[in-house]
């Protein structure tokens, strides 16, 4: 269905503002459960951006993997840990916070510079010089993504699964450790 470009620009504007507000909610809220819910909102906005770009498979994978698995895992881990919340909204900045802010800002600006100065269309056409633009559009994207994941990007794909497994084991370990400490304190006071 062909819609006017202003319609796409309006939806894009709403999605980008949702991304910015959701990201600010993740960073600024002191309640970790609310931050995790805002993170899920950010993931949904990203998947809607993929739908806007006609990347249906990537949008579905974004919803299933990030919202359905990673964000739910984060919420369950946070609820199992059950840490006390900070009552003060404004926490004091330390030197480490300033160093982290400087480092993250410089990495963001460096990546922004590289991304904006790279001609992406030339890179894709240089890697596949015998493809015509009509042939590029007709490539089955799901099959292409699957073959690239299992051939060219097999090692990063497996490393990502190992990182997610370590995060899951770490969340379970933290939840069990908190429970053991509570039980030991209760046993101590019973004597």
Swiss-Prot record:
Q: What is its EC number?
A: 7.1.1.-
Write out the function statement from the record: NDH shuttles electrons from NAD(P)H:plastoquinone, via FMN and iron-sulfur (Fe-S) centers, to quinones in the photosynthetic chain and possibly in a chloroplast respiratory chain. The immediate electron acceptor for the enzyme in this species is believed to be plastoquinone. Couples the redox reaction to proton translocation, and thus conserves the redox energy in a proton gradient.
Q: Which organism is it from?
A: Marchantia polymorpha (Common liverwort)
Where does the record place it? Plastid, Chloroplast thylakoid membrane
- Family, as annotated: Belongs to the complex I subunit 6 family.
* The protein's name in its UniProt record: NAD(P)H-quinone oxidoreductase subunit 6, chloroplastic
- Gene transcribed to yield this protein: ndhG
What membrane topology does this protein have? Multi-pass membrane protein
Q: Which NCBIfam families match?
A: PRK06638.1-3 (NF005163)
């Amino acid at each position: 269905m062909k819609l006017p470009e202003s319609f796409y620009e309006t939806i894009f504007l709403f999605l980008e503002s949702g991304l910015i507000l959701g990201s600010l909610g993740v960073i600024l809220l002191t309640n970790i459960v609310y931050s995790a819910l805002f993170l899920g909102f950010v993931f949904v906005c990203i998947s809607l951006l993929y739908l806007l770009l006609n990347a249906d498979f990537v949008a579905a994978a974004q919803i299933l993997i990030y919202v359905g698995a990673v964000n739910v895992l984060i919420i369950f881990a946070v609820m199992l840990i059950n840490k006390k919340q900070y009552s003060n909204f404004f926490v004091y900045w330390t030197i480490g916070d300033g160093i982290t802010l400087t480092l993250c800002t410089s990495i963001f600006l460096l990546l922004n510079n590289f991304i904006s100065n790279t001609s992406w269309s030339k890179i894709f056409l240089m890697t596949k010089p015998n493809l015509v633009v009509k042939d590029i559009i007709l490539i089955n994207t799901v099959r292409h993504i699957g073959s690239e994941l299992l051939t060219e990007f097999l090692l990063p794909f497996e490393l990502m699964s190992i990182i997610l497994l370590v995060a899951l084991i770490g969340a379970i370990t933290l939840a069990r450790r908190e429970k053991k400490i509570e039980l030991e304190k209760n046993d101590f006071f019973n004597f």
